Amino acid sequence: AHGASLTNIEFMQMMPGFIEPKRNLVFNEKTWRYVTFDQPVDIANEKLDDLLEQRSGYGPFTSRLASRAIDLAVDQAGAEGLALHYDFPRENVPEFVQTFATWLQDEHGIAPSDEMRVAMYAHAANGGIKIDRTAYTGVEGLYACGEATGGMHGADRIGGLSSANGIVFGRIAGASAARAALDAPEADAPVDVALPEHGIATAVAERLTRCLKHTMSAYCMINRTDAGLSKALQELESLQDEATTLNKPRANDSEIAALARLQSQIQLAAEMVKAMRKRTESLGSHYRAN
């Protein structure tokens, strides 16, 4: 509505994490080499050890390497997660393994030999608001940096660099904004702006948000297909229609905020899916199964 653009929003960092025996725990990617699967996976036994070793070298999913087969096996296990346990060496244990195993045991009561279930989590965005070398967004007076922006990570963001991104482009954005403010004409007197009055019941917003999460998890994680992405767009359109139908006038502040947040999330999700459909080849974190 204001003139800024998005870039690279089809590229997401997706990483494995625990869902059993405890949810939302980080899975240390360096420990893949010590994993034993407790259920069948569609990987030849003679290739499995090499793929696990390769997969131990980086965190987020990439379609670029053969070890994508490990992530695809996790994704194929679905919402129940892939069952596995650790078989750590008894001698010459690397320090990071000792630290991780101790943390699991002491902080969460999980022994390495316990069965665990791992699923894929959406971790961070590679894309975002498009900026130029001065951090300018294309909207007069508006500069951006950090996780809200895209373009500096590319298709594969196998490591972090979030702090470096924020520091480097934060400095650039701050300096650019300061120069623009010095050159800008004096602002006009503020005018009264009509605030929105329509909102949506909190319970309804929570239900529609759960539906939104389900749609994006089902069709827009690792295994992306044209049919699945088309289905996602249909479901998002239905959610937007339902949010419009169920909103109400003279809402309270919480309900107004809930509607604005929900509609923005649905709109962003739809733009992400369109970008995923448009890119028909696999590239970096974007994997097209067909």
Tell me the role of every PLM-derived stretch.
Residues 13-20, 119-125, 186-198, 286-289:
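A glycine-rich phosphate-binding loop feature that marks nucleotide/adenosyl-phosphate handling sites
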Residues 31, 134-135, 284:
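Glycine-centered positions within short beta-strands or beta-hairpins
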Residues 252-290:
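C-terminal amphipathic alpha-helical interaction region
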Residues 136-158:
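Short FAD-binding loop at a beta-strand-to-alpha-helix junction that anchors the flavin cofactor
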Residues 4-112, 176, 180-182:
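An anion/pyrophosphate-binding glycine-rich loop and adjacent beta-alpha core
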Residues 99-140:
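FAD/FMN-dependent oxidoreductases across multiple families
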Residues 180-255:
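Long, amphipathic alpha-helical stalk/connector segments used for oligomerization, subunit docking
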Residues 2, 151-177:
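A conserved FAD-binding loop/helix module that cradles the flavin
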